[in-house]
Amino acid sequence: EDQDGVIDTVVEKIRWLNDNRDKVIDVFMEDNYQYVDAINDMIEKGTFQAYEPISENDFREALVIDNVCIFIRGRNSEFTLDLDAQPDYLLGHLGNMEIDSQYEVEFGGLNG
């Protein structure tokens, strides 16, 4: 594929990601909602520094996109990304998300 086509594909994927952040986080939360309770248990025990318990919204707002990889195979380009949390509600892990060429989102597991 020519360089302009590659750039267009990258721009398209990043634009989609910016427009669909909530969709990606929704899929992540389906498999990882328990982190909110785990962090709140740690806050209560004093093993996680926070001023007060967190809500699901606090957790969702802490998630940031990191390490985007785009695989270009003609029309069938796919991409993966890692979700990190600031503060570190994922306890040193990153949530790997996979997005196929039809923009179907799957949780690929935790890294780290």
Residue map of PLM features:
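Mature extracytoplasmic or otherwise solvent-exposed domains
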Residues: 1-22, 26, 75-80, 84-86, ...
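Acidic, proline/glycine-rich low-complexity IDRs
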Residues: 57-63, 67-112
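Long, charge-rich alpha-helical interaction segments
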Residues: 3-59
